[in-house]
Amino acid sequence: MSALPDLRGKDLSALTPKERYRILCGILPTVTLEELLEYRKMICTLVPQLRPSLGFDQRSAHHRYDLYTHVAHVVSLVPGDLTLRWAALLHDIGKPVAFTLDEEGRGHFKGHAPLGGPMAQTILREMGAPEEQINRVGFLVTMHMARLSPDEARLRQLVERHGLDAVTQLLALQRADMQSKGVPGEEQVERFVAVAEILEKLKS
């Protein structure tokens, strides 16, 4: 249970970005899915850039929820690490901007991840977040659609470039993102397990 219920009745819109950041840092590690859904308007007041996600119909067979509800599920599914939860909260921030419809009325979000990375960094920078956190969230948001393959040489290169902790967090974000869309296929589950095993091996 987070401190979200205690904020009811307060004028959150009058808070400075730094004050909103401090509140969210106190909330995110322990917030539940139920709270994220019940207090969705409150969350979107604390992060106004999330407002377009409220009720946003993704028009896709790959998504069973509106955009905000999907984001809420992802936040609740990743571990309670603060930086990882910030990345989960902002991972699809680029979707409303990237959204297009094809001739059959299906929604597409081409390039939303690399578009969203800098957007997430801008949000956190305006809130006064530490630069290390800004950089990590930017990496995770930008890369959350990149396929992690169980190829030890490639994973080793990725780890050497970004660090084992960052790549481990990326895997956690991708797993949560996939789970929130429905039951992952057998191939996806096996791939995630294989990647996790290689990352565990690289720790030694």
Specify the residue positions occupied by each region the protein language model found:
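Short, mixed-charge aromatic SLiMs
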Residues: 9-17, 111-112, 143-148, 195-204
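Terminal helices and disordered tails flanking the catalytic cores of nucleotide-processing hydrolases
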Residues: 2, 181-204
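Glycine- and charge-enriched loop/helix tracts that form the active or gating conduit
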Residues: 1-81, 85, 93-107, 118-128
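Divalent metal-dependent catalytic cores for phosphoryl transfer on phosphate-bearing substrates
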Residues: 75-183
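A glycine-rich phosphate-binding loop feature that marks nucleotide/adenosyl-phosphate handling sites
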Residues: 53-56, 136-144, 191-192
